[in-house]
Amino acid sequence: MPVPPPPPPPPPPPPPPPPPLGAPPPPPLGAPPPPPPPGPPVSTDTPSLRKPDLKGRSALLADIQQGTRLRKVTQINDRSAPQIEGSKGTSKEGGAAGSNARGGNTPPALGDLFAGGFPVLRPAGQRDVSGGKSGQGPGSRAPSPRLPIKAISGPLPAPASPRLGNASETHSSARPVPPRPSVPAPPPPTPPPPPPPPLPPASPIKAQLVSPPAPPTKVNPSVVPPPLPCAPPLPPPPPTPPPLPPASALSDKAVRPQLAPLHLPPIPPPLPLLPPCGYPGLHSEPNSPAQEVREPPAPPPPPPPPPPPPLPTYASCSSRTAVAPPPLPGANNSGSETPPPLPPKSPSFQTQKALPTPPGAPGPQAILQKKRRGPGTSGGKLNPPPAPPARSPTTELSSKSQQPGGQLRNGGQHAIDDFESKFTFHSMEDFPPPDEYKPCQKIYPSKVPRSRTPGSWLQAEAAGQSSDDIKSRNSQLSLKALPVR
């Protein structure tokens, strides 16, 4: 209270602003009522009325100043402290708990925000903290709240563990856990690439084909580096020759090579690129046996087909890195039956060949195309190669079926050529020659009414011309004007 008395002296200066109410304020300062002769009584009354006002103002100023002092004391932070202190009590109280608690407990607020900002979660978290001291772990580290959501194993060991030391260990152990899920995560992407399941329709043996796809999905999680894909396909060919040449062995052979490459490629981890590279070769093999089984010369061709597939697969890998169509013709010449090597180049040809040869196969293989295009780059990179089919017309059916699809997949030029080839156009000679141009005076009916009055037609009729004559003349004029246009 000793402080308020000094402020009253300053209040007199503030009163001057209110003087607009009347000149009385100066009279109090200069007590003489004589200066204002007209209203001396008023001046005497005003000071008596204004004195309480001054006192009230001084009280208001004192209150305001006190408020400012209270703000300087920063009681607001103290008010916020008790809330954090409550959480401190639940967690841990150290010698320097004041600053440390504030600094360490601010993250829990972030944790609450991450948790969703629901007030209900806070007491639940505090209860867990009271049960086990691991609560400080999330407090000290904001990311920890996220970890419990991903892997609950982290927070569970923490309660048994002591304070931050073990909590940090648990968090470190919990952090590697997320990468592990990321490692198994690749299997979901791998299932789309495995196109072997659709293969069964091409080859009679379905059970054996169904069994191989399962192992690749299991082994594929480790699949990562793409560079090795080209090398692994080469080893699989040796296992292919051992099978016997007979047609019955052919189907088994087609199945066995598939099993071998499926198990081998996953080891040299070629996840995205190899499955498209290797699988087309596999597709070519089942297609070739199907064709060969139907054709009479089945026994002789079996040995040659195994060697060509590795070449086309390697060529396909190289073509994806740098497009090189020539290897395909070489493979075509080397193989006794050219159609099988072509499919590895692009999956689109497989379906086109499957349509003429095996009737049941087109549906599943069409699904294969969608799956392959879905995984991504393989479909886009295979677009340019489709040109070769026209170069190597192995069979009329295959070449005809491949040309339209391949050209449509090529650039716009091929599409334009196909579009024009669908229609027959007449030459300039087929059309009748235009009428010869003869200069003549032209009369435009639109200009006639402008030059003459609206009653010109009536005048013309009066002159002896009937409306029919006028109409015939106009029609003739319009006919003459048409050729000029």
UniProtKB/Swiss-Prot annotation:
Keywords in alphabetical order: Actin-binding, Cytoplasm, Developmental protein, Differentiation, Methylation, Phosphoprotein, Spermatogenesis
A Pfam short name: WH2
One function term, GO molecular function aspect: alpha-tubulin binding
Span(s) of short sequence motif Profilin-binding motif: 3-8, 11-16, 31-36
Assigned GO CC terms: early endosome; synapse; WASH complex
Residues bearing PTM Phosphoserine: S161, S211, S392
Disruption phenotype: Mice are normal but males are sterile due to defects in spermatogenesis.
Polar residues bias: start-end ranges: 392-405
Tissues expressing this chain: Isoform 1 is expressed in brain and testis and isoform 2 is expressed only in brain (at protein level).
Subcellular location: Cytoplasm
Compositional bias segments (type: Pro residues): 1-41, 176-203, 212-246, 263-278, 296-312
Span(s) of short sequence motif RLRK: 69-72
The WH2 domain, residue ranges: 56-73
Residue stretches of biased makeup (Low complexity): 247-262
Span list, region Disordered: 1-485
Entry's free-text remark on domains: The WH2 domain is found in a number of putative actin-binding proteins. The profilin-binding motif has been implicated in the interaction with profilin and SH3 domains.
Functional note: May be a regulator of cytoskeletal organization (Potential). May have a role in spermatogenesis.
Quaternary structure note: Interacts with WASL, and monomeric and filamentous actin.
Protein name: WAS/WASL-interacting protein family member 3
Provenance organism: Mus musculus
